[in-house]
Curated annotation (Swiss-Prot):
Its EC number is 3.4.-.-. It holds the Pfam family Peptidase_M15_2. Keywords: Cell wall biogenesis/degradation, Hydrolase, Metal-binding, Metalloprotease, Protease, Signal, Zinc. This is Probable peptidoglycan L,D-endopeptidase MepK. It is an enzyme of class 3 (hydrolase). Pathway: Cell wall biogenesis; cell wall polysaccharide biosynthesis. Binds 1 zinc ion per subunit. L,D-endopeptidase that cleaves meso-diaminopimelic acid (mDAP)-mDAP cross-links in peptidoglycan. It works in conjunction with other elongation-specific D,D-endopeptidases to make space for efficient incorporation of nascent peptidoglycan strands into the sacculus and thus enable cell wall expansion. The lineage of its organism: Bacteria, Pseudomonadati, Pseudomonadota, Gammaproteobacteria, Pasteurellales. The gene is mepK. Belongs to the peptidase M15 family. InterPro entries: DUF882 (IPR010275), Hedgehog_sig/DD-Pept_Zn-bd_sf (IPR009045).
Length: 186
């Protein structure tokens, strides 16, 4: 086979593919090219506030939604707001996806924690880390309404990124964006 015949075959193949794509219904093309909206719903159990929205857009995180999430995750004692690590929210989306959930209500027990609140908590409980990831805006304690805690723990651990603490007696899971590690608390 000579060079011209090989080129002809390549062009005919590409033309066939292009023709095939052009006759697909627009709805199929839209499904293929449009990413799924990444929506999360949170309820802060300390304030009663609820927030639901798309945290991630096609070109990255939604700055407006992240700002609202920062406010929702604020220190419950001092009312101080701190920028949260956006990767936490991606982690929550992945946890839900692993569980086969969409937009389930995530109950926030603790998001950001100021240094003074953390010091106070350390005096009350030896289980509070001196350099907690909560102080850095890189940790959230939570549970998902209606989902057994052990399933949420397994889903979080399967991601193999960041820390996962399991607190069955206190009824929450801790996730953070630090090094990979797991532990069981009370």
């Amino acid at each position: 086979m000579n060079y011209v015949d090989q080129n002809k075959r390549k062009w005919l193949s590409l033309g066939g593919i292009a023709l095939g794509i052009s006759i697909l219904p627009n709805s199929v093309l839209a499904m293929v090219s449009t990413p799924k909206p990444r929506i999360l719903t949170f309820r802060n159990i300390n304030t009663g506030e609820r927030l639901s929205g798309e945290f991630s857009l096609a070109k990255g995180f939604s700055p407006a939604m992240l700002k609202k999430l920062d406010y929702l995750m604020r220190d419950k004692r001092t009312n101080q707001v701190h920028k949260m690590d956006p990767n936490l929210f991606q982690k929550f989306y992945n946890i839900q996806t692993n569980l086969g959930l969409r937009n389930a209500e995530i109950e926030v027990i603790c998001g950001y924690r100021s240094a003074s609140t953390n010091a106070m908590r350390r005096r009350q409980s030896r289980g509070v880390a001196k350099n907690s990831y909560h102080i850095k805006g890189k940790a959230i304690d939570f549970r998902i309404a209606g989902v057994p805690l052990i399933k949420v723990k397994s889903s979080a651990e399967s991601l193999r990124n960041g820390g996962v603490g399991y607190y069955p007696t206190s009824n929450f899971i801790h996730v953070d964006t630090g090094p990979v590690r797991t532990w069981k608390g009370v």
